[in-house]
Amino acid sequence: MEILHSKIYGEDKSGTPLLVFHGLFGMLDNWGSFGKEMGEFFPVHLIDLRNHGKSFHSPEMSHDDLAHDILHYMEFHNLQKINLLGHSLGGKAVMQFAIKYPIKVEKLIVVDIAPKAYPPHHQGIIKALESVDFEKVTSRQEVEEILHQYIPEKSVIQFLAKNLYWTDDKKLNWRFNLKTLSEKYSQFVSNAIKFGVFSGETLFVSGAKSNYILPQDEFQIKQQFPNSSVVTIKNAGHWVQAENPTDFNEVVKDFLSEHRV
């Protein structure tokens, strides 16, 4: 059984551990500042999803696979009860886990994603990534120039370029498993979370400038997460924690520290 790669902050702190999962083409490093800050209060596990970062590669990538990975991670680290936070694809993973294993989850935070099916919307990015020939490129700059032919937003190119690394045979490559992410894309993006209910305290956080969570999604959210609320973070798009970290961190801290009766 392979265990997800992680970086742990605040390991010596008491309190329920918070497990944090990034989005598609991301990695745990995207959440480094958040982990450091929250690790002052309770243990925080920043985790690479399968086929991302330094976690194992696999041909399988369903929501159930992602949920099982979280279960195995908990067992390996001897965690009994956890708080979960997931952004985008990571949000789908934590929703699926909470519905399958509700007894293991104290509180759930879902960042800028709903439990619904989404139409495919990363084709341009996947095409850009597949257009890079690592037999030919010799620098990060060359890779970024190729990506720029397909992707106009500099911030997206920089986000993707964080995944570049030098292999043992002195070639650049992606840390994520592009083959599986491309082949299984519809499995994890176009599929809704399996129907089920998680009754624990749940917070959905959306970016004011993002369209991933729409007002009409709130009915389905309440069906599956009856004890949930939706908070919108101003001056933030889909990458909420990066675009307005001050407000985002405050909202998360408040939610996790509340003791409701």
Language model segments and positions:
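Conserved alpha/beta-hydrolase catalytic His-Asp/Glu region
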Residues: E135-V189
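Conserved serine/cysteine hydrolase catalytic core
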Residues: D169-Q224, S229-T232
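Catalytic active-site module of serine/aspartate enzymes centered on a nucleophile-bearing elbow/loop
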Residues: S228-V261
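Active-site glycine-rich loops that stabilize anionic/oxyanionic intermediates
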Residues: G23-G26, S88
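Serine-hydrolase catalytic-loop signature spanning alpha/beta hydrolases and amidase-signature enzymes
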Residues: F25-S33
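Active-site loop/oxyanion-hole signature of alpha/beta-hydrolase fold enzymes
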Residues: K7, G35-G39, H45-L85, L89, ...
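Alpha/beta-hydrolase fold catalytic core
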Residues: M1-L19, G39-F42, L79-Q80, F225-N227, ...
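Flexible "cap/lid" loop of the alpha/beta hydrolase fold
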Residues: Q96-I99, E106-T138
